[in-house]
Each structure stands twice: as C-alpha cells, then as structure tokens.
From Swiss-Prot:
One Gene Ontology cellular component annotation held by this UniProt entry: cytosol
Protein name: Phosphoenolpyruvate carboxylase
Enzyme class: lyase
Gene3D superfamilies: Phosphoenolpyruvate/pyruvate domain
Function comment: Forms oxaloacetate, a four-carbon dicarboxylic acid source for the tricarboxylic acid cycle.
Family: Belongs to the PEPCase type 1 family.
Length: 940
C-alpha cells in the first residue's frame, strides 16, 4: 500500500490565508518605517517581477537609494521567513491530527511496525536499530538566535489561528500579539555583527534541545516501545534515536576548537539534560501528593523519603514527595559537580560555598524558576554535603525504578504514565551526557604529531618520508609491542602537538566521568591510507584510550574525494586484516563505522559521479565486512543541499544500496536544516520519525529491483557517470575562465565574510577551487541561483547515452520506475532545477569583468537546458515537481519575493565593488544572503 508524504496533506487554503495576514502586518510595519512611498516602491518591484520585465526591474532597483535598499532588503528577507513559519505550523498541525485520528502517512512509525512485525527477526531489528542525527556547526544557518526566538513566538501564535477562526480565542488580542512580533522582527538586526565563537555555536544548538529535541526524542522512544508491546515483541533496551554532536569536537580546519571547547560542549550538554531532569522531578514532586495513610510504599522509597532534605511537617506523611525531593537534591549536587569543570568533589563544594546565598547558586542556570522553600532545603543539604551526587545516570535511573516498582507493587500503576514515564524514558536515552560528541581532525595533522613524537623518542627521525609499508610497520610495533607512551614531560612540544594531546586527555577525562557514550568516535578527514588510521591510534594510546585489546574511541575513516572513495575498498581490506584491529572491533560489538563525504566528492566530480561512487563504495565496504563477520555501519556526511548529499531524508535512506544498512546509521544535520527540521517539537518528532521509519523500512524490505537487471543498470551507470565526471571537470577544473567566473559572478567573497560560523571558509588561502571548502562553494551557487553542484554534467552525460542507441531513453525510464536509487538521484535533480533561475543567473554573470569570463555562463546555460529536457523525458513529466505538489505550491508562494531579493543583491554587489557602500550598508548584502537562504530552505 502506498502512503502519501505528510507534506502533501498541507492545507494550502489555510497557509494562503495566514500568509495574507502576515504580509498585511509586514506591509504595515514597512509603511511605519519607510512611509507609503517606501511600501509602494516595494510593491512596484514585485509587479515588475510578476510581469517578467526583468530589465525594468533591474533599472528600478539601480535607481533606489541605499536607504531604500535597507527597507527593501529587510522586507524581501522577512516575508519568505514568515511563509516558512506558516508552512511549519501547518505541518505540525497535520502531524498531530493524523496521529490523533490514526490516519496513515508515509513514514508513520505504526505503519512501519506492521511491516517489521512480519519479519522472522523482528525482535533483533527493533532491539538494535539506532539512528543518530549528528548536529554540526557548519556555517549555513545565518539567522541570529534572537531571530530564531522571534520566529518561535510567531510560530506559537499561528498555531492558535484555527482556534481564533473557531472563536475559541479572542481575535483582536491574537492579531495584536502577532502584529507586535512582526513589528519587532522588522526592526531587529537580522544578522550577527560579530563572528560566532565556538561557545556561541554550542549554546545555540542547545536551544533546540530545550525547545524541541528532548521532548520529541522522548516521545518517539516511548511510542517505539509501546508499538513493540502492542505487537507482542519483548525488547530489553531499544534506542531507536540517539543524538550526536560535532560542535566543540570538530577541529578539522577550525583552530578555535580546543580541549576547552570539547569540555565546554560536554558540560553544557550535561547541564541542559540535568536541568530537564530537575524540572521533571519538580513536576513529579508537585503531583505525587499520595499520603502514607492511604497507600503503601516500598522500603526503598521509604528510605529515600527519610534521607530527604524536605523536613516540613506538612509533608511528613507524603513519602513520594519526600523521595522526589531527595532525588532532586542529588541531581542538583550532580549538576554542580559537572559545572565545577575539573570533575572533583572539592571543586563542586567550593563552587557551592561561593554561590549558595540562595537566589545566587546560579539558580537561573541550574533550575530555572524553582526558588521556593523545598528548593532552599535541597540546596542547603547540598551545601552542607549531606546529599551525595549521582556518579552515574544508571544510579539515578535505579532510584526512579524503585519508585516505579513501589507504585506497581501497591496498585498505583496509573500514576506511572505522563511525566514519570517521560522522565524514565529520557534517562534511558540521554543519560547525563545528552549527545555523543564526535572528534574530528585532518589526517595531515595526525601525521605531523606522530612524526614529532617518534623523532623526540629517538625512534624515527624522518617518519613522513617513509613509504606506506614502512610507516605501518613502525606504527604497529609501537601499538603492539611497546606499552610505553612516546611523549615526555621533559621534551618541549610544538603548539600543534600540545593542543592535540590536550584534546585527547580531555576526551579521556570526559569518558571517565560522564561515561563511555559521551565520546565514541574520532573521525579522520582525508583518510588516504592505513597509516592514517594507525597514526590516530598512536595519539589515542598516548592518553590511555587505546591499548592492544581495546579502543575506547573508535577510529573512523572519512573517505571524501572520488579517488579516496574508489580506494576505500582496498584500504579497509588491509586495515581490517590486522589482528590488533580485529580485537578492537570485537570489543566494539563487531561494529566498524566508516564516514562517507558527500560534499567534497561532489565538488571533486559532480553530482552524478559523487552519488554513484558513494553507492558503489557502500556496496563494496559492506561486502568486506560481511566476509569478516563485521558490521560495517555508515556515517553519511550530508548537507542541506542536493549538491552536498541533501534531499528528502526518507527517500535518501530508503534508496541506499540494498543490504548496506544493518541496524545503525548516522547522518549529519547542519546549518539551516537544523532549524527547519527541529525548530519545534512537532516538526522534530515528524522528522525523527521519518529517519527511524526509513531505516527500518530499508532493513526489512527485500530487494525490489531484479538482480539481473541491476547488473545491466550498473553497467549503464558506470558509462554515464564516467562521461558526467569528465564534463563536470572540464568546466570546473579545465576551463581557464571558470575560477574568475565563480569569484566574480557569485557572492562567494561576501559569503566568506558572513558571521555565520566559527570556522574559516577555507583551510588555507584560496588559490584554486580545490582549496575552497565545500560549504561556501555550494552556498554561493545557491545564492546566484545556478545550483551548479546539484546538476551540472547530468544532462550531457544522459543525452550522450540516449543518442548512442535507439531504445536507451526507454531503458533510463525503466530504471527510473524500478530502481529506488536512480529514482531518488533524478528526483533530487528535478528539485534542484526547480529552485534554479537562469534569468537571475544571467544578471549575476554580468558582474564578471570581462566578456571571456562572462562567456562561461553560456556553457552553464546550455547544460542547464539540456539537463532540464533530459530529466523531464526520463521522468515522463511535463514540468518540475510533478510528484511534489506541496513543494511546488510552496515555491509559488515565495518565489516572487526572494527572487526580487536576488536582483537587489546583484545591485548591492555592484555598489560594493565600486566602493559605493559604507561599512553599515555592506551588511545589506549579508541580509540578502540570509533572505535568499531562508527562501530556498536548503542552501548549504
């Protein structure tokens, strides 16, 4: 049975009505700032665009003053944002409605369970499935935290719109509240004045946990267990969703990530989840007013009640309340222990004695608004060291289980549902660490550090000059035969080595105190050899995280370029063959993770080449694991755009090569994608549900493509992809004018100066395309509306194949109909092309200084037109997005506004490059960049 995507159910009538209200309010705010004439100018620009008179539009914008530009840039940036909010509210409404009335939709967990339950190994699948979204700080989320908060206020008001229409809420007050927030938004700085620090990135992401992720993950995990019970499947401790984090641990190309940021990331995460627990326990304290005169309690709960700091005579007969008071006291002590920084009891006590003038224990940080008598007693107990802290989350969980068992034993099981059940579930998922932090560094840094260590220990003077075979021999000898560390406190170290060792020491400390789950992987960027992995092992050995039997941090290679992906098969064959590696993997439950880089492989070889090389690499690596009895699991380094591996998550997962998803999958969530997917608890629940359902679906679905046909399909793809790679590289790396075209006909220079992340736009000074990071590369092509990384080279390659032999078009059409991977591949191109605009791109091309450079656009335009024709022919469609009517309607709402913004951006870039903008006015370009990214929704 086929189900519709939930997005296809959206109510365009309601969205249109809300957009009308929001536009009216934005018009009023604009009129207040710029007068009637200012608003008239804006409306005139929209009319010119609607009429298709782009020359007149360009002329009108060129005649605007810089002051006019200020208002227009804000207007055209904010309206797409307001449209986004309305669409998000409608999606949240549909999520709740369809779940409450038990109506089907694609990816609904209960529907997926029906399929899984029919499998012979249903229990194993459900027990072991684990999907891990990993939040990263890649710089494509350009909104300020303040703007995100305003967005949430408007979101909450729009959620009440249907109640307003039904007369359940006063319309005038609702409208006045909405007007106020739109007015504030119009007069608030949209972009950051200063570049983010790593700490800012960490705290920004933590807001998503507070507002949506903790609630959504807890709810989904509970629903997962409930459905298993409903199907009669007994599970021990399933973890369908856990979270990952790169911020604070990803130092590849980011010199601002240090041991301190790693510790900060871990401790802030602990604070967030402990604050959540403290709040939940407080709620339970308030509600569990059961009297010992009317109900029995277990001896364990009675003992907890005796230890409670709550000695009020009014609660002496309320054992559950006093037990929760005891638990909360321990949680507060635990929180202070982690906030102490060096994880010592003495430091925690000192911090407490300095701050416990109640009202100043940083109670705002610690427990929000819970300053009342009971909390005073809890804090007093903590300050007097009469309450111990929880050394592990398991100990906290045990106390909660004791209360649960007491309720069950005494016929009070009805009280377990609600807050209590949510709290238990949250502890099982998040522990005291909240999310697993990944570490990442470039392989060249590891090599330099190991070379320095080997030289200082008088083992090898010129390690970097050794052959690969010689390097591996040296490294294995140190790992297998010599238990001593290479570093010495008596030998001076380079700044790089000192910094790396400090990070690894901190990782060891965090694992010792917060548990093994807090840091589980270290990723090696640009993995090109086995020695790259053993070099990391040497550094981990220095701090006791690796020995001959066990690696407490798994070594994860990242294969990024086309060449590295093609070589990954041979590299992993060799690596997995070493006895020491076999022992490490055996002690990791026979899992070996491999990260796949979508961004760099795309920049290296184009969309088709990247997608196909990744597909083949997964098949080959999975086979290597199966031959050795090892579960190879993949970490997909996907961005928001198709050019960086993005696209609909459900389709992306269900189109993975058959058999390559065992039970665990990790994938990056970055930039504006985090806000779009997890900005509110309903959207977060839906998107997490999609990930889990898609993974389960791919695990249980039998191969639907005929195996014999698949052999033919692969041969066809090999031929087409080779051609596509050549066409792409001929332009990007072979055309002598392409470099200048990219830097002159796109806002790459302006994007690089945006204050949207702590990491530089390039690892070093940019002298060619290969030196540019993939994110600003893709982001800039999104801004000038060419979207080149998502389609270039596709049209010509397919066209060459079609023209080579009669009937080849029909073969491609058959592949599209029967092969999920191919269908997903082409559907993403369809979506990208729908968001591109060659009229706008033409005007960006005019920014180039010479005719030779501008001529590059003609090459791009010809390929775009060819790609459009070929894709529609293979799909048998007349227009883009025929299978995504909701996205088509969404673009129809927003295109007239953020398309005008592109023309404004072009004019501002002209003025900037002619030195006709002040420093304050330069920020207008950044506002337009923000607005276009907001309108596209997946720009980097």
């Amino acid at each position: 049975m086929a189900f519709n995507k939930l997005e296809s159910s959206n109510n365009q009538e309601i969205i249109s009505e809300e957009v009308g209200i929001l536009k009216e309010l934005l018009d009023d705010a604009t009129r207040g700032m710029a007068g009637e004439q200012g608003l008239t100018t804006i409306q005139h620009l929209v009319e010119l665009y609607d009429e298709g008179d782009y020359e007149a539009l360009t002329q009108a914008i060129s005649e605007m003053t810089n002051d006019d530009m200020v208002v227009a840039s804000r207007y055209f940036s904010l309206l797409p944002l307001l449209i986004n909010i309305s669409e998000d509210v409608d999606l949240a409404y549909e999520v709740n409605r369809k779940n409450n009335i038990d109506e089907s939709y694609l990816g609904k967990l209960s529907e997926t369970f029906d399929v899984v339950a029919e499998s012979d190994n249903a229990r194993d699948i459900l027990e072991n499935v684990n999907v891990v979204p990993v939040l990263t700080a890649h710089p494509t989320q350009v909104q300020r935290k303040t703007m995100l908060e305003l967005t949430n206020h408007i979101h909450e008001l729009l959620r009440k719109h249907r109640d307003v229409k039904d007369g359940l809420i006063n319309k005038d007050k609702w409208y006045a509240d909405l007007r106020r927030y739109v007015e504030i938004m119009m007069k608030t700085d949209i972009i950051r004045e200063k570049k983010l620090k790593v700490k800012n990135e960490i705290t920004n992401v933590m807001e998503y946990y507070n507002s949506s992720l903790i609630k959504a993950i807890t709810k989904l995990s509970h629903e997962f267990k409930r459905l298993a019970v409903e199907k009669g499947i007994e599970l021990d401790n399933p973890t369908p969703i856990t979270m990952g984090m790169w911020i604070g641990g990803d130092r590849d190309g980011n010199p601002f990530v240090t041991a301190e940021t790693l510790k900060l990331s871990a401790t802030l995460q602990s604070e967030v989840i402990l604050n959540y627990y403290i709040e939940k326990v407080d709620n339970l304290y308030r509600s569990f007013s059961l009297s010992s005169r009317l109900t029995e309690v277990s001896e364990t709960v009675a003992e907890m009640a005796k230890l409670s700091p709550d000695t009020s005579v009014y609660r002496e007969n309320e054992p559950y309340r006093r037990a929760f008071s005891y638990i909360q006291s321990k949680l507060i002590q635990t929180l202070l222990f982690f906030k102490a920084g060096n994880f010592s009891k003495e430091r925690a006590a000192k911090r407490l004695s300095e701050n416990v003038r109640l009202g100043s224990v940083s109670t705002g940080e610690v427990v929000a608004d819970f300053v009342h008598d009971r909390l005073s007693q809890s804090l007093q107990a903590v300050s007097q060291q009469t309450t111990e802290f929880y050394e592990t989350a398991e100990a906290f969980h045990d106390d909660l289980l004791a209360i649960k068992n007491s309720l069950l034993e005494n016929d009070d099981s009805v009280l377990i549902s609600g807050d209590f059940e949510e709290l238990l579930q949250a502890v099982e998922v998040f522990g005291f660490y909240l999310a697993t932090i990944d570490m990442r560094q470039d392989s060249s840094v590891h090599e330099a550090c190991v070379a320095e260590l080997l030289k200082s220990a008088n083992i090898v003077d010129n390690y970097s000059e050794l052959t690969e075979v010689e390097k591996v021999a040296v490294l294995l000898k140190e790992l297998q035969e010599d238990p001593r560390t290479l570093s010495s406190t008596n030998v001076s170290k380079s700044e790089t080595l000192e910094k790396e060792l400090a990070i690894f020491r901190t990782a060891r400390l965090l694992k010792d105190y917060l548990g093994e789950e807090v840091i589980k992987q270290h990723i090696i960027s640009h993995t090109e050899s086995v020695s790259d992995m053993f070099e990391l092992a040497i550094l981990l050995k220095e701090v006791g995280l690796v020995d001959t039997e066990r690696a407490r941090v798994q070594i994860v290679p990242l294969f990024e370029t086309i060449e590295d992906l093609e070589n990954s098969n041979e590299i992993m064959k060799q690596y997995l063959g070493y006895d020491i590696v076999k022992r490490w993997i055996k002690n990791s439950n026979n899992y070996q993770e491999i990260m796949l880089g979508y961004s760099d492989s795309n920049k290296d070889g184009g969309y088709l080449s990247s997608g196909w090389t990744l597909y083949k690499a997964q098949n080959e690596l999975t086979n290597i694991g199966e031959e050795r009895g090892i579960k190879i699991t993949f970490f997909h380094g996907r961005g928001g755009t198709v050019g960086r591996g993005g696209g609909p998550s459900y389709d992306a997962i269900t189109s993975q090569p058959f058999g390559t998803i065992k039970d665990r999958i990790r994938l990056t969530e970055q930039g504006e994608v985090i806000g779009n997917k997890y900005g509110n608890k309903d959207a977060a629940y839906y998107n997490l549900e999609m990930l889990v359902s898609a993974t389960l679906d791919r695990m249980v679905t039998r191969q639907i493509t005929d195996p014999d046909e698949l052999v033919d399909f692969r041969e066809i793809m090999d031929s087409i992809v080779q051609d596509s790679n050549r066409i792409y590289r001929d332009l990007v790396f072979g055309n002598e004018h392409f470099y200048d075209y990219f830097f002159e006909a796109s806002p790459i220079k302006e994007v690089s100066s945006l204050n949207i992340g702590s990491r530089p736009a390039a690892r070093k000074t940019i002298t060619d395309i290969s030196g540019l990071r993939a994110i600003p590369w893709v982001f800039s092509w999104s801004q000038n509306r060419i979207m080149l990384p998502g389609w270039y080279g596709v049209g010509s390659a397919f066209n060459h194949y079609i023209e080579a032999e009669e009937g080849n078009l029909e073969k491609l059409q058959h592949m599209f109909e029967t092969w999920p991977f191919f269908r997903s591949l082409l559907s993403n191109v369809d979506m990208v092309l729908s968001k591109s605009d060659m009229n706008i791109a033409f005007h960006y091309a005019q920014l180039a200084e010479s005719e030779e450079v501008r001529s590059v656009f003609n090459i791009i335009l010809d390929e775009w037109q060819l790609t459009k024709n070929v894709i529609l022919a293979i799909e048998k469609h007349d227009d883009f997005l025929e299978e995504s009517p909701s996205l088509k309607a969404s673009l129809g709402f927003r295109l007239p506004y953020f398309n005008v913004l592109n023309y404004i951006q072009i004019e501002l870039i002209k003025r900037l490059r002619n030195n006709n903008l002040t420093d304050d006015e330069i920020s207008l370009i950044h506002i337009t960049i923000n607005g276009i990214a907001t309108g596209l929704r997946n720009s980097g």
